Amino acid sequence: ENWIMGEAGSIAAMVRMTGDDATSMFEMITIEEVDGSLVLHIQQWDPGMVARTDGPQEMELVEITDNSVKFKATSEGGMSALGYSHPDADTFIIHVENPGRPVFDIPLKSRSIWK
């Protein structure tokens, strides 16, 4: 998950999910300032840029703290809520809530793309 620095009222991320020497999914996330709050849009693609849905899922801000943010879905999609936290300088945690399932966390560690 790679985030582009915020500028002009927006921030964006590109995600690539890999495993077993193959890419299984790409994801684009944007967060924009809208009417004094934040709106998140998220969309996923299979390899070959085959969209998994007709369009992005939209979420609205429900909570923000010094080191976390949480959004809830306002349109149809795979998630009912999505959050992020940054408990320390090297850790970034994605909090995913799917309908009818408990929240699961995806902890990420900082790493260089220039290995």
Annotate each predicted stretch with a short phrase.
Residues 10, 79, 89-92:
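Coil-to-beta-strand transition motifs
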